[in-house]
Amino acid sequence: MKEILIIIILGIVEGITEFFPISSNGHLILINYIFNIDKENIQNIIKIIQIGPIFSIILLFKEKIKKSITFFYFNINNIKKKLILILFNLVLSCIPISILGFMFYKKLEEFYSPKYISYFLILGSIFFILSEFISLKKIKIDNFKKISFLKYFIIGSSQCFSLLPGVSRLGITISIGLILNIDRYVLFKFSMILFSSIMPAVLILEVYKNFFYLKENIFFVIIGVMSSFLTSLIFGRTAIKIMKNTSLIIFAIYRIFIACIILFTCN
């Protein structure tokens, strides 16, 4: 019963934190140390329960996805060059983090400790605050079509930093994008698209690597995934509204607070 409760808590935390630049991995690993979960088990669970938010993101943006599919199906011979470039740039943005993730995933696991998480939470927060001040009073790019090839590539490359637990994929996307003069809501949507594009490949790799563990613990895996899916689906629309206009400084303060708690309680 205790194990089921912990898995549900992990799923709820994943479902909420995935929509904010506060590092879902950092929070899940903090819970690991609170409940004293085996390190190997928590890493397996963290990666697998991210399936939930992926499905919720697809459902939350289903109308836009449906329109895109309909457009391609009925207008295959009339696709505008600009749209093709946008899709190409989105795919290109996934490449840097995919390559580094596959090459160094073993090495990156060494950073899954409270000490490193707290350091990366603080460093990320400092960068978030700086990005808000750098982008102050600039006219923002408010459409995917206006984002240049170079800016797509820079944002995509910056995703590599989010491989470090505590940095936040969403946070690094928005902060780099703000510096590049892009609207924060456009960046939020872009980050969600990147997440739903990259994570399926990562999850396939994790299932392959941990097949026997997952097979033996399939009941807990299902509970964790369902918990994260339902939470992110219920909370997703509210999170989207919050992220439209909320400064990264608010989240940076929270991250520093969490980092201090981790430093003083988990080390």
From Swiss-Prot:
InterPro entries, A to Z: UppP
EC number: 3.6.1.27
Enzyme class, broadest EC rank: hydrolase
Subcellular location: Cell membrane
Membrane topology of this protein: Multi-pass membrane protein
Coiled-coil positions: none
Further facts: Bacitracin is thought to be involved in the inhibition of peptidoglycan synthesis by sequestering undecaprenyl diphosphate, thereby reducing the pool of lipid carrier available.
Task performed by this protein: Catalyzes the dephosphorylation of undecaprenyl diphosphate (UPP). Confers resistance to bacitracin.
Protein name per UniProt: Undecaprenyl-diphosphatase
Organism: Wigglesworthia glossinidia brevipalpis
Organism ancestry: Bacteria, Pseudomonadati, Pseudomonadota, Gammaproteobacteria, Enterobacterales
Gene: uppP
